[in-house]
Amino acid sequence: MRIVLTNDDGIEAPGLLAARRALEEVGEVITVAPDRNRSGVGRSITFGAELYVEERRMADGGVGYACSGTPVDCVRLVALGMVEGFRPDIVVSGINHGENLGDDITYSGTVAGALEAIVIGVPGIAVSLSTGRPWHGADGREELHFEPVARFTARLAGLALRDLPPGRILNVNAPNLPEEELEGARVTRLGRRFYQDELIEVRDKNGRVGYNIYNNPPGHHDEEGTDFAALQSRRISVTPVHLDLTDTAGLKELESWDIGRLVVR
């Protein structure tokens, strides 16, 4: 199994290293990740500029590649032949430092990296660990348990390669617990967030007005069967996700609007 591994926290993130160690037990892994933190970039790509890649020695002595672009760029580079003779069978993105649940997944560079697997025609898995703070804001006081979900992902990758239908990825989220405290895993649907941000005006030293808008943690609706509910019950959540955003249930209703009459000849 040939695995391309990426993330959005950057090449030096500890979750990336934990994922690589586990995945190397089940396949050949090429690690290509952003050269800096790219959290929240979604499916953005690099237009009108070159992508630069440099070999980087990782904390365990292994070799990875640091890319100047986004997680999507990283996956596309490997798919197009950046590493001679290597064509990925599956994409794994993560392990993200912080959960990617519910409505938040459309913001996520981690999930976007896995979604690019659909574009290149292979299965994909996005993996995140629910932590108190994102990696770039961590203060080192929170104990992090990447290894349980890393091992789970390595086992899941084999199943996904064999059985996951085309056009679909798996979004995996794990509570930050040691393996013996996990209550298993559950197949879930995406939950629903509600956001509590405020508009706060600030001024820099030159008097220029700016705004702080992402300042309060989001909440979520308590609903059974969701990814949120799984984590609250100390379980790993696995949610199937596809790239086609068409609201098929809304097609018939929209057809009743007779929008053709809006075109004036």
Curated annotation (Swiss-Prot):
Domain of life: Bacteria
Predominant cellular place of this UniProt entry's protein: cytoplasm
One GO CC term, this protein: cytoplasm
Gene3D superfamilies: Survival protein SurE-like phosphatase/nucleotidase
Keywords linked to the UniProt accession: Cytoplasm, Hydrolase, Metal-binding, Nucleotide-binding
Uppermost EC category: hydrolase
GO molecular function, one term: 5'-nucleotidase activity
A family per Pfam: SurE
Required co-factors: a divalent metal cation
Disulfide bonding pattern of the chain: none
Cell compartments where the protein resides: Cytoplasm
PANTHER family: 5'-NUCLEOTIDASE SURE, PHOSPHATASE, PUTATIVE (AFU_ORTHOLOGUE AFUA_4G01070)-RELATED
Protein family: Belongs to the SurE nucleotidase family.
NCBIfam families: PRK00346.1-4, surE
Protein's recorded name: 5'-nucleotidase SurE
Originating species: Rubrobacter xylanophilus (strain DSM 9941 / JCM 11954 / NBRC 16129 / PRD-1)
Lineage: Bacteria, Bacillati, Actinomycetota, Rubrobacteria, Rubrobacterales
Gene: surE
